[in-house]
A protein has these predicted regions:
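Structural transition elements
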Residues: 287, 315-348, 364-372
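Aromatic- and charge-enriched surface segment that lines or borders ligand/interaction sites
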Residues: 82-125, 147, 231-237, 286-288
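N-terminal lobe/hinge region of extracytoplasmic solute-binding protein
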Residues: 37-88, 119, 187-188
């Protein structure tokens, strides 16, 4: 009798599990919106405040920019009707705008709306230096004609106008937010409108009055998970349709790539736009010593780190600009050479009786950071233990970003993605300095980057590049980076390709030139 009851209980449990499985499959099949998952919360959808890749990803679907970079790498009009028209003296830029475009609130997109958005960004934007360093004034010359007056000629402005941060917002909906951020809403001109928002989930739906190519799906649910394991589990159990690679553990990334090879998933990859690097605080000893910084530039075995940390998925990098933006092979930072490092450290009194100790901070919530820190520390122990030691300190990323400009870290692991695909979008945020005392930066982007390093000649070359075009401009920016390599305030480590994986019944993810998934092209079979 007891055995019979056990069998009945087993059958009951089996039936319940079967029903739950069928319900789960049924829910999966009936899913209308495509669910896209990434790591980290989204606290604000204001383009003037956006500074994370996940925020820019959703904004790219909710808004449009004046221009885009097409597949061939050339500037292409989007909200603009034609390419910018530049005056002979290079100080006036006229931008004709497309007509018959409306915002999600029904108001009309025109030159007044574009001027409102650009001026708002100039006033409160987190990255407002991008415009304020270049622009004198913005004028409305006609209902659909915008004029930008420059402080001096700028060859990079056109590329800058492709930045998602400069997507226009409706003056009607943002009339009370001219001087402050509108964190929980977004009203733009894009192919989707925002249906609901909280920091963990955002739902967007196709905008029926969209002026351009309509989305191929019925909507997107953005889900923001807290860690890599949850993201990895969600795509494996089909809880989500698309997984974005940001903050995915590299071992799990390798597993996902193997699932693609076995035809269990699809994947898409964009041009490498994210650089990983270490910043050295150069305004205080021992790292104020240029020879010490130069020695450190020889101490990192990028090939070893790439293999041990990322299984080769992160490409070793000896530049602070993604190579495709220079359009030529360029590696100004030196290769790994512990003997050269030892010789340089000996000239400064280390190795024989004194060991140089460098505290290295890594972001505790970024999986690759800790592995990089551990690998470098162990490599130093193996090759340079008589001269150098690395001590480790893990701090949550938001705290790191807040304290960078305070000079809280002697050495810190960071990453950077340019706001637009141009060398200047990497060089200026790391190297620009408005007030110098010898090689110590007192005011400027080099302070906010945590290096506090500057160079007068480098600054002159950065400014000169704005007067140049084409090959001459690229060659000038290469000179800038050579000086940065000699300064040694940054140590580039690797280059990261944006990647996404999708379930078999979802189309292969496609990426734009700015490293963002083209969400409107995602389609369920």
């Amino acid at each position: 009798m007891l055995k019979l009851n056990c069998i009945k209980n087993i059958l009951k449990v089996s039936s319940i599990l079967l029903i739950l499985t069928q319900l789960s499959c049924s829910q999966y099949k009936k899913r209308e919106n495509i669910i896209v998952a990434s790591a980290g919360k989204i606290e604000s959808l204001d383009p003037a405040q956006a500074n994370t890749l996940r925020t820019l990803q959703i904004l790219s679907a909710l808004g449009d920019t004046l221009y885009k970079i097409n597949k061939e790498g050339n500037l292409s009009p989007s909200l603009a009707k034609d390419l910018p028209k530049v005056s002979k003296n290079g100080l006036l830029i006229d931008i004709p705008l497309k007509e018959n475009i409306s915002f999600h609130d029904g108001s009309i997109f025109n030159a007044e709306a574009m001027a409102f958005s650009l001026n708002r960004f100039r006033k409160i934007g987190t990255l407002n230096y991008l415009l304020n360093d270049k622009i004198e004034d913005i004028e409305v010359k006609g209902k659909f004609l915008l004029r930008i007056k420059l402080k001096k000629p700028s060859s990079s402005l056109a590329s800058l106008l492709t930045s998602v941060n400069l997507t226009p917002v409706s003056p009607d909906s943002y009339s009370n937010y001219k001087d402050s951020f509108n964190n929980k809403k977004f009203v733009g001109t894009g192919p989707y409108f925002l249906e609901s928002f909280n920091s963990s989930q955002q739902i967007i739906k196709p905008f029926k009055n969209y002026w351009g190519e309509k989305p191929l799906n019925k909507g997107i649910n953005f889900i923001n998970y807290s860690n890599s394991s949850t993201l990895f589990g969600a795509i494996k159990t089909k809880e989500v349709d698309v997984l974005i690679s940001n903050s995915i553990d590299d071992l799990q990334r390798l597993t996902l790539n193997n699932m693609v090879k076995k035809d269990q998933l699809k994947s898409g990859e964009g041009d490498p736009i994210e650089i990983g690097y270490i910043t050295f605080k150069s305004n205080k000893l021992p790292l104020e010593n240029k020879v010490v910084r130069k020695a450190l530039s020889y101490t990192i075995d990028r090939e070893l780190i790439s293999q041990q940390v990322s299984f080769g998925t992160r490409e070793p990098l000896r530049s602070i600009v993604p190579p495709q933006l220079h359009k030529k092979e360029f590696k100004p930072w030196p290769k790994y050479n512990p003997n050269t490092a030892r010789s340089l450290l000996k000239t400064e009194g280390y190795c024989e009786s004194e060991i140089l100790s460098i505290p290295l901070t890594f972001r505790s919530n970024v999986p690759a950071d800790k592995l990089l820190a551990l690998t470098w520390r162990d490599q130093i122990k193996r090759d340079l233990s008589d001269c150098l030691e690395i001590t480790l300190n893990g701090i949550e990323s938001t705290t790191v970003y807040k304290q960078l400009s305070e000079g809280a870290f002697e050495a810190v692991i960071l990453d950077w993605t340019g706001a637009y695909p141009d060398p200047e979008a990497y060089l200026t945020p790391l190297l620009s300095c408005n007030e110098l005392n010898n090689n110590s930066c007192l005011k400027g982007e080099a302070v906010f980057s945590g290096s506090f390093w500057g160079d007068k000649k480098l600054q002159e070359l950065l400014e000169k590049s704005e007067e140049l075009d084409g090959e001459n401009r690229l060659n000038n920016l290469i000179k800038v980076e050579k000086l940065a390599a000699q300064g040694g305030a940054y140590l580039p480590i690797w280059l990261v390709n944006p990647k996404a994986w999708s379930l078999k019944d979802i189309s292969q993810p496609e990426f734009s030139k700015d490293g963002l998934i083209i969400l409107k092209n995602l389609e369920r079979d």
